[in-house]
Swiss-Prot record:
EC number: 2.7.7.38
Gene3D superfamilies to which the protein is assigned, alphabetical: Spore Coat Polysaccharide Biosynthesis Protein SpsA, Chain A (3.90.550.10)
Taxonomy, superkingdom: Bacteria
GO cellular component: cytosol
One Gene Ontology molecular-function label: 3-deoxy-manno-octulosonate cytidylyltransferase activity
NCBIfam families (UniProt xref): kdsB, PRK05450.1-3, PRK05450.1-5, PRK13368.1
Protein name per UniProt: 3-deoxy-manno-octulosonate cytidylyltransferase
Cellular localization per UniProt: Cytoplasm
Similarity-based family: Belongs to the KdsB family.
Organism: Myxococcus xanthus (strain DK1622)
CDD domains the record matches: CMP-KDO-Synthetase
Transmembrane segments: none
């Protein structure tokens, strides 16, 4: 049997409202997009790593450090739409992994875990979860995942789920990490679907898949990614890099 080809795609746009030009922000001497690209390469889980963008400045930067950039439409509303546009023209690629372009500390081992989910032929879509501490689980900014015994997601919510009716009942809550893998046909199908009621209510794009009956397998990891949302986050990430020695 021929093995599946797996590609990581890093969506990157220049026109961020809160942080214009974010992919090109310099962090410890390199652009943020290069940090993410390098960590994808370190994972050794992908046949290729591409950056999907609609901006020539990002394309030039990616090609400057030896990466491959694929130009996509400015009309793409989400990173998933951008990855799907790339996948539309590449029927030879089986597995597509959407890697957030604003997480320069993404752990290569977590990317390996995500790509590895698709060794199971029954997995159509995958993502990652991490164990939550009680103090962070209550925050609506931390998305919780409720899992079935086989690791499939039952639901994702900003609310504190599951609810513990009797105090003292032990429960492990899981936090969602926003990295996704798809089989090509699932990715293309999702990109064509309109937003769903629960997706609109929670503002969580992954609920579109669950509402349409597409199972999402979750790999459990321990590392926690750090996103760069604002210019002030750059210094925080640089401090973490220094603390970790890289």
């Amino acid at each position: 049997m021929q093995s599946c080809r797996t590609v990581a795609v890093i969506p990157a746009r220049h026109a961020s409202t809160r942080f214009p030009g974010k992919p090109l922000a310099i962090i410890a001497g390199r652009t943020m997009i290069e940090h993410v690209w390098r960590r994808c390469q370190e994972a050794q889980a992908f046949d290729e790593v591409w950056v999907a963008t609609d901006d020539d400045r990002i394309r030039a930067a990616v090609e400057g450090f030896g990466g491959k950039a694929v130009m996509t439409s400015p009309a793409c509303a989400t990173g998933t739409d951008r990855v799907a546009e790339v996948a539309l023209g590449r029927p030879d690629i089986d597995i597509w992994v959407n890697v957030q372009g604003d997480e320069p500390l993404v752990d290569p081992a977590t990317l390996q875990r995500l790509a590895g989910l698709f060794q199971d032929a029954s997995v159509r879509m995958g993502t990652l979860v991490r164990p939550l501490e009680a103090d962070e689980a209550a925050s609506p900014h931390v998305v919780k995942a409720v899992l079935a015994l086989n690791g499939d997601a039952l639901y994702f919510s900003r609310s504190l789920v599951p609810h513990v009716r009797e105090p003292g009942t032990p429960v492990q809550r899981w936090g969602h990490i926003g990295l996704y893998g798809y089989r090509r046909e699932v990715l293309l199908s999702l990109a064509k679907l309109a937003p769903t009621p629960l997706e609109d209510a929670e503002k969580l794009e992954q609920l579109r898949a669950l509402e349409h009956g597409i199972p999402i397998r979750c790999a459990k990891v321990t590392s926690h990614t750090v996103a760069v949302d604002l210019p002030g986050d750059v210094e925080k990430v640089e401090a973490l890099m220094r603390a970790r020695g890289g």
